Structure formats: C-alpha cells, structure tokens
Regions:
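Redox cofactor-anchoring modules in respiratory/redox and cofactor-processing assemblies
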Residues: 1-111, 117-123, 131-132
C-alpha cells in the first residue's frame, strides 16, 4: 500500500470510489500511486454508502448549468458538441476554453450530465489539434 493510502486509512475492501482533488473539482481515479503528488489538494476514499451513483439521462434543456456558470458559458452546448466530436463547435458555442472547471454546472445538473468530463476532453482535444 502507498504512503498516501496508509495516511488516509485506505481499505481496498471498503473503498468503491476514489476522487483526487476534492468533491467539487476533483476527478475519479483508478489508483492511489499514480495520482498523489505534492500538488494534490485532496483525496476522497468513498465507501458504497458514501457514493450516490445515479444514471445520466438526456439533457433536459433546463438551463441550470448556464445559470450558475460564473463565466457565463453554456455548458450544455459543450456536452452536445463533444459527444459529436465537434470540439471547435464546443469552443465556439459552449466557450469551453474559457471554462475554469469549477464544477458548479455539474453540481446543479438534474440529468447528471458529465459536464466537467466533457469540458476537459474538449479542451484537451482542442489543444492537441491546435498544437499541430
């Protein structure tokens, strides 16, 4: 077991989900060794009773994600364009490159859309394509 695991009280029999970075801006990780470094801000080790796994449904077009966005972006457009692999559309219509990845949109989404994951994917693809 890693030093981080020992410090956190990691129990592989109880832990069903690990989140690196905290509850709002963190991301799910597979293992402790590859994700913990001196810049890691937090590490959540969750048991089955501490997770609320809900299924993602189609976007309801409620606009809650846009209402809470501190950058006044349209996160719902990012998911739409990212699912279609139209990353330029995500930048143009969703403003994905201006996103600060605060997680507010994902927190309020009643459809549990993977907003932050879509934003991170679109940003990575855009940077990769524009670097060529």
């Amino acid at each position: 077991m890693s030093l981080a695991g020992e410090a956190c009280g990691y129990d592989p029999d109880r832990t069903v989900k690990m989140v690196s970075g905290g509850p709002m801006m963190g991301f799910a990780v597979v293992g402790l060794d590859s994700t913990t470094k001196k810049t890691t801000g937090g590490l959540l080790l969750l048991s089955a009773g501490e997770t609320n796994v809900t299924k993602t449904t189609h976007c309801l077009s409620c606009g809650k994600c846009a209402d809470v966005c501190p950058m006044h972006l349209m996160p719902m457009n990012t998911v739409f364009y990212t699912e279609a692999a139209d990353y330029e559309g995500a930048a143009r219509m969703g403003g994905v490159l201006n996103c600060i990845e605060c997680g507010a949109c994902a927190y309020v989404c009643p459809a549990r859309q993977p907003l932050i994951q879509s934003i991170r994917l679109a940003k990575a693809e855009l940077r990769k394509r524009r670097a060529k």
